Amino acid sequence: MINNLIESIGIALHNEFGDDYKIYPEKVEQGLKEPCFFISCLNPTMELFLGRRYFRTFQFCVQYIPAKRGKEKSECNNVTERLYRCLEWITAREDGLPIRGTQMRAEFFNGVLNFFINYDCFVTKTSDEVPMMEELAYKLKG
C-alpha cells in the first residue's frame, strides 16, 4: 500500500506541476534535475482497531528542491500553497477510492522545502482459508 500511495502522490504532483518538475520516488545521488520533488514514507504505523480491522497511518515527506535563482524562499512559499491544494485529496491506486491528507505542514530548511502529510485509513485483514477436515474418527470409552 505504501508504494501505491507514493505513486498516487506522484500522479497528483505531476497533475499540478506538469513535466517541468521532476518527481523522484527514491533519492538520487547524481544527475539531479531541479526543480524536483522527492517522495518518502517516514513512519507507517498499524494498530488493531476491532476484530480484523486495523487503523493504518502513513506519514509522508515530500521534499521540494527549487531551481537556483536567488528566490528559493519565495518559490517554496508558492509551492507550499499548491501542495496544500493538490495533496489534500488523492486517489489511491489500489482501490481507486479517494483518501484525504491530514496534518499537513511545511518546513523550509537549508534551501529545501519539506512538506509533511499523513494519509490514514482502515484496512481489514483477510483470514487465510484453512481447508476443512473431511472425516473425524473418534472412540468413546464406556
Language-model segment annotations:
Residues 33-42:
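A short, hydrophobic beta-strand-centered structural micro-motif
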Residues 24-33:
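Short acidic low-complexity segments
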Residues 1-24, 44-142:
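Charged, amphipathic alpha-helical segments and their flanking helix caps
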